[in-house]
């Protein structure tokens, strides 16, 4: 089996990879392994999750690529709130898919490793959870399901749900569901709706999955 290392932002993405992506790719003869970003290291402890500087991401990705030259490396980082030193991040192309493809290409060129393909989640991981609003009945009442459905209907796709500090997908869910647990609930919801539903509703995510399957 070939291996794809997915360098990801934190434990929420790690749980999603292990629970949702792993069985899908295992059936295709591909082993996906999450590697969580380390924000810093002390003598006796590692701190995982979050993104502070692009330079740190680049350095870790290059090490990962060179350590596994015959395997593939990709990423799972939220486009929302990426560091300002990220190459191409200031691009203002109106179409979000065109913009994100351009930025990913610029980053891939900057990293310069043939076995690396950078991938952003639009606008963040929680965006994919709007792919099937009725799934929220697993963790909340009908009023929340209706509210999630209304939000989804405002946008062309789940990946268009925007990225301001007040209206990013995670902020919307936290406002709707007191005590919303990102790791537990995010994994539960995405697993229940299934990868095929997510791919149908999220074109950029779908292309990423297809690219990995074709490597």
Q: Model-flagged regions — what are they?
A:
Residues 1-4:
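Extreme N-terminal starter segment of soluble prokaryotic enzymes
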Residues 10-12:
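Long alpha-helical, hydrophobic tracts
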Residues 48-54:
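Non-catalytic terminal and connector segments of soluble metabolic enzymes
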Residues 14-44, 58-215:
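C-terminal accessory helical subdomains adjacent to catalytic cores in phosphodiester-
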Residues 6-8:
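Short hydrophobic beta-strand that contains or immediately precedes a catalytic carboxylate
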């Amino acid at each position: 089996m070939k291996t794809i290392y997915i360098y990801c932002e934190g434990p929420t993405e790690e749980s999603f990879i292990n629970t949702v992506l792993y069985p899908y790719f295992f059936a295709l003869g591909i082993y996906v392994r999450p590697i969580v970003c380390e924000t810093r290291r002390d003598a006796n402890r590692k701190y995982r999750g979050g993104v502070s500087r692009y330079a740190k991401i680049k350095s870790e990705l290059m090490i990962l690529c060179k350590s596994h030259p015959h395997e593939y490396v990709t990423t799972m980082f939220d486009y929302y709130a990426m560091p300002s030193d990220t190459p191409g991040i200031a691009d203002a192309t109106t179409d979000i898919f065109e913009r994100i493809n351009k930025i990913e290409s610029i980053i891939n060129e900057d990293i310069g490793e043939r076995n690396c393909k950078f991938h952003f989640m639009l606008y963040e991981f929680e965006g994919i959870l709007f792919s099937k609003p009725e799934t929220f009945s697993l963790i909340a009442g009908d009023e929340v399901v209706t509210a999630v459905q209304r939000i989804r209907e405002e946008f062309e796709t789940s990946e268009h749900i925007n990225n301001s500090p007040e209206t990013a997908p995670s902020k919307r869910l936290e406002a709707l569901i007191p005590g919303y647990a990102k790791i537990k609930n995010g994994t539960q919801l995405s697993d229940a709706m299934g990868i095929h539903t997510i791919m149908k509703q999220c074109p950029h995510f779908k292309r990423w999955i297809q690219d990995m399957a074709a490597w």
